[in-house]
Amino acid sequence: ERTGNYITVAKDYGNRFAIGQGISIGAGLWSQSLAADRRVTKIEDSTEIDNAVCVYFDGDPVAITTTSVLWSSLQPTGATIEMASPNGRVEGKTNGMSAIRFLWIEDWYGNMWQFRDGDNIQSWQHYYCNDRSAYADKVYSGSYFKVGYVASKTEGYVKEFGYDPEWPEIEICTVTGGSSATYFCDYYYQAEGGEVVVSGGNVDSGAVAGPFFRGCNYGSGFSSWHIGGRPQARK
């Protein structure tokens, strides 16, 4: 065991990381038991182990062991802030690991699941609220209105979205049967006990992630490293 601000890993694995990248360290993949949401500050060849590199990170020192696992977690925001274009990716980043921007929105999908406030579910039926002051979990009346269709009870790639002329922006899957190359090419998760909506997927979602990727299978009390939110306004 060694306490410090670096972890030594195989060179081919360590070279996947970059300065400024968000990382976590734990007892296994997706574990943050040792360090959560740190940033890589330096990567250099190990002087102690052949064909290995030391990946340095910010924050408090960590007790590293031979079984500790380094992995890429949610990426910090701001990578595209200097871009002049509303769309694209950071110049020179072509390895599939860079932040992207669409209509000025950074990492619209694929970095973290983004919680959609104002959309509650009860047995596949969605209830929608457009009054931010009235947002609340497990509310299906009052400021929350019943959407004019029931979501699909089968998960899979999205083939069709429901349409309610009162709330056209909701776009919840009603028919699955697409694929990663046909129809909307994004996935839909569901469960009878699902109560909230998360969108976009996260860093480990792979090909199923996308702007229309919806998770409607979580309860309102669920939390995890890969679920967050996005501010809709700034004062």
For each feature predicted by the language model, list its residue ranges:
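C-terminal, surface-exposed recognition/capping segments
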Residues: 112-120, 139-235
